Amino acid sequence: MTFRWQTDWFQDCMPLFSCLLEEAERIAAGKTGDFGKMGDLLGEIENICDPVEELKNCHYAGQMMNVRSALLDLTQTDQKAELASYTLLPFLWELREEIYFWGCVAEDIEKRQVYWQEEFVSHHRRVNPRRIEQKKVTIFIPACNHLEYTKQCVESVLRHTDLRECELLLLDHGSKDETAAYFHTIPNAKVIRFRENVGMLMFSVAFRACCGQYLAFVSNDTIVTEGWLSHLLDCLEREENALSATPVTPFTSNCQGIAPCPLEGLDEFAKDFYEKRKGNWRHRARIMPVIGVYDVEKLDAMGFGDRWFQTMEFWDDDVSLRARRKGFRQFLCTDVYCHHFGSVTGGVAWGHTLAAGRELFLQKHGVDAWGQGFCRSEDMMALLPEMELPETSISFLAVDCGIGDSIFEVQNYLKEQGKQVQTYALSEVEGYRGDVFPFVQGWHTAVEGTAAALTNAFAERRFSLILTEKSGLSGEILAERLLPGGYVLAMDSELTKYLRLAGRKGHWSLWQKM
């Protein structure tokens, strides 16, 4: 692992961290560690870092407190090797990374971009010495206060999960109530205790600590239902290049939710929900995972949570973008229903941090997280069943559909109808290429403009369906690119002169070539 942007003071920290990590790894291996020496090393790091102005507005101080508290806990437990493995080592790795990123990288735009391109993944890989304890799934439940909700969540996981192949990590993320004491009553659970809440670092600690082939994140304001984990794993194991699988939950945006079911009938509702929709898995451009199961090997290839998103808003949009550009797919499993109370932990501060998180996303990626195509329209979805496409092989053209959620939902629908789909896409914005190209058979950047590109791109092809989120396109050109009987599904468009109106819903309309 390299640290390209080391300052003089950070170089002074590096040998101290090497000694700390060496001692921690000795303890994790079941050997005796020198706790006094480790405390002294932390003191030396504090002497170097405390005056650094760039570290005043990050989680350096909080994470230093977490490391010191973990060290104290180690002196008071008989389970030293285990605690060092899943708490002290991940805490130290995150402390070092917090100091490096905010102290040496974050202030400079060029350094940030190089860091994200060349260092982020290697700096966030899982480095876990507990190889003898491999499990299929690590389930992690973070909680910051709200013990009454946390108990319902944990009890539902214990009730509805076969834990013989699972590791259960319970993260007390700076709670001031009795959360930590409750967590310690759960048999066979591993409790990671943050004395200080350190935002996004919590996700990285959980990832570094896990020993499962899959990592299941369960928010403490949810209740899981019978079969939740096996059903989500079924999707991950069957779908090609699947990074994550997420259930339907109420009080969730991004067209991922439905109206809540009364808790008294939750289990029966979820069982019936699954039987009626079994295997209905929808590839989506972005996912908001109040519950999400991830393929750990793929997370290792792209990194998980990014500390850049200090407000904890848009971190999931960031993960989704990086997944798309790796060619990994995220699935909303519309056959799995779990309950969500609705951002019990995060809801209070949400209004204050949303705009800040969106700006951080723009600064990192140069595109708006809520830009064109970030979430498909319910009106568009309502028009899809109005199409009559008798052919089994569908040639599909997407025109200026941005991030691509509408593209993926049309693909989902056509595949549900038993169609073989060949998808082509064109856009005036080259920046969307990485979001869409891995999932289509052809891409064209319309540097000549969309109207001209509709004439020139994929010139040898005619299409059964054209989808466009760009208004004002020529109906004549669109009709020319259609096969007889083909459709245009368009937003804010009037194509009456050249095509027959087959349906209209809100801003969307469906047109057919006769």
Show which residues each predicted segment covers:
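Short, acidic, metal-binding catalytic loop of nucleotide-sugar glycosyltransferases
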Residues: 155-165, 413-416
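Conserved donor nucleotide-binding strand/loop of the catalytic core
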Residues: 180-199, 209
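A recurrent flexible, glycine/aromatic-enriched loop bordering the glycosyltransferase active site
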Residues: 200-201, 208, 251-252, 256, ...
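A conserved acidic beta->alpha catalytic loop
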Residues: 172-180, 402-403
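A short, conserved alpha-helix in the catalytic core of glycosyltransferases
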Residues: 227-231, 285-303, 308-336
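Conserved donor NDP-sugar-binding/catalytic core segment of glycosyltransferases
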Residues: 226-261
